[in-house]
């Protein structure tokens, strides 16, 4: 049995188990009170998420399990849908990259740890393409029922996961490494989403205080100016709607437009998504009214996390 690398995949290790490494009875809040390292790391990570910068893999960070939970709880405490989505997207990207570099045995171990009964039993499939005989190595398999269960949502968004696209033999569906990783990432993302959305979790006081401080930031001056105007042109209206949606205030969008469908339109789909202009673009449009030293109005709203 392999030993899982919790430094690289900290979400696999319960916080309580990590805290046992310290003095008996110590809590995460006790550690946060004793020093600023974990909060500083969490703020830096969230700042990078908001600025769409590349994140480090957790195994490059000291005490990665505690940094992960501090970041997770801070995102939960800030309670913003846009931030949660960006957090999940960014973390999922790193996880996928790491999993693709893992050995077959490690992937199976991680899958089993998550409750996915994935088997490693390599088979070679011969097929013809353009009159040439080619071979495909399928190293993993899932029980037919488990395949349908774990790919239920994936099949809605990606035809590659339809049963018709796979080899079914002796009650098993055979898969490539890339497909297994995709399934794992989807399951892990769902696990993280549940963790960040749990309402009854006790968020450490130090994290709650920081979140309250960050949420207390004022509305950007440019947005305040637009809210004061009695009449808005199409560009100004679009900016205000995008701002409300990005901060998770859909009610204000409906109040402003009297149209419940506008939220769905501006949230976009796979091909189209509306985002708030950068401060540079706001200046070009003549909508900037103050020097805030930020790159985007949302940075003013969430704070610079400094």
UniProtKB/Swiss-Prot annotation:
Keywords for this protein: 4Fe-4S, DNA replication, Iron, Iron-sulfur, Metal-binding, Primosome
Cofactor(s) needed: [4Fe-4S] cluster
Residues annotated as binding [4Fe-4S] cluster: 222, 279, 288, 292
Cofactor binding remark: Binds 1 [4Fe-4S] cluster.
Transferase is among the record's keywords: no
UniProt keyword Transmembrane, yes or no: no
Biological process annotations from GO: DNA replication, synthesis of primer
GO cellular component terms given for this protein: primosome complex
Superkingdom assignment: Archaea
SUPFAM superfamilies (alphabetical): PriB N-terminal domain-like (SSF140914)
Residues annotated as signal peptide: none
Transmembrane segments annotated in the record for this chain: none
GO MF annotation list: 4 iron, 4 sulfur cluster binding; DNA-directed RNA polymerase activity; metal ion binding
A Pfam family annotated for this UniProt entry: DNA_primase_lrg
Quaternary assembly: Heterodimer of a small subunit (PriS) and a large subunit (PriL).
Family from the record: Belongs to the eukaryotic-type primase large subunit family.
NCBIfam families according to UniProt: PRK09568.1
Its job: Regulatory subunit of DNA primase, an RNA polymerase that catalyzes the synthesis of short RNA molecules used as primers for DNA polymerase during DNA replication. Stabilizes and modulates the activity of the small subunit, increasing the rate of DNA synthesis, and conferring RNA synthesis capability. The DNA polymerase activity may enable DNA primase to also catalyze primer extension after primer synthesis. May also play a role in DNA repair.
Identification of the protein by name: DNA primase large subunit PriL
